[in-house]
Amino acid sequence: MSLLSKTRELNTLLQKHKGIAVDFKDVAQTISSVTVTNVFIVSRRGKILGSSLNELLKSQRIIQMLEERHIPSEYTERLMEVKQTESNIDIDNVLTVFPPENRELFIDSRTTIFPILGGGERLGTLVLGRVHDDFNENDLVLGEYAATVIGMEILREKHSEVEKEARDKAAITMAINSLSYSEKEAIEHIFEELGGTEGLLIASKVADGVGITRSVIVNALRKLESAGVIESRSLGMKGTFIKVKKEKFLDELEKSK
């Protein structure tokens, strides 16, 4: 397969995910397929965002890493010290992705490391490993292209998260501001009683405790539910099950006191 064909295969995957979050496992599998390598896509904190492995599954340490979805902190630190592509790293180098304890299995192995950059900052690392055969120039071009694309996707996800947090905060603020004084007091008392983000509410108990009518509690909950801040489900005589949908709600409620 030519370099152009390999690049197109990676582009096809990204176009398939247009408008939705990219699954980095799919990205890793595509990179693995076109480069015939073991692949790790790692965040700057060492979280494994995506991987596609073959020969490395012979190592118990690698299997454990995959289960934990995290690489060791010391290896993460070493990766973050790599500022530009480093290719054809052998088994005796501390940057090798292959386990040194299985040196005899991976004596001819080669590791290549591509820093993932975006928006002027380091976002993670793309690590490719081969049991045999050096990485050639075409491999490096494809790897650097893949690292660039991954960086763009990580940035897009980060921006989406920031936008979602802003929307959630606005919805929470509007919901809290829509409550009357007595409704807000009722909501504060409800979550003090629950002691967390979800639990069972007995409206009559709260009404008696705060000294308000049950209808005030019902109206307050209805306002929060219509704003998408909480969800509730009647359990009949047992009460009402309440769950917070927007995680910053309780913090914002506390700040508004």
From Swiss-Prot:
UniProt-listed Pfam families: CodY (PF06018), HTH_CodY (PF08222)
Record keyword Cytoplasm present: yes
Cell compartment(s), UniProt: Cytoplasm
Matches recorded under Gene3D superfamilies: 3.30.450.40, Winged helix-like DNA-binding domain superfamily/Winged helix DNA-binding domain
One GO-annotated biological process of the protein: negative regulation of DNA-templated transcription
Broad class of where this protein is predominantly found: cytoplasm
HAMAP family (alphabetical): HTH_type_CodY
Xref: PANTHER family: GLOBAL TRANSCRIPTIONAL REGULATOR CODY, GTP-SENSING TRANSCRIPTIONAL PLEIOTROPIC REPRESSOR CODY
Name listed for the protein in its UniProt record: Global transcriptional regulator CodY
Originating species: Staphylococcus aureus (strain bovine RF122 / ET3-1)
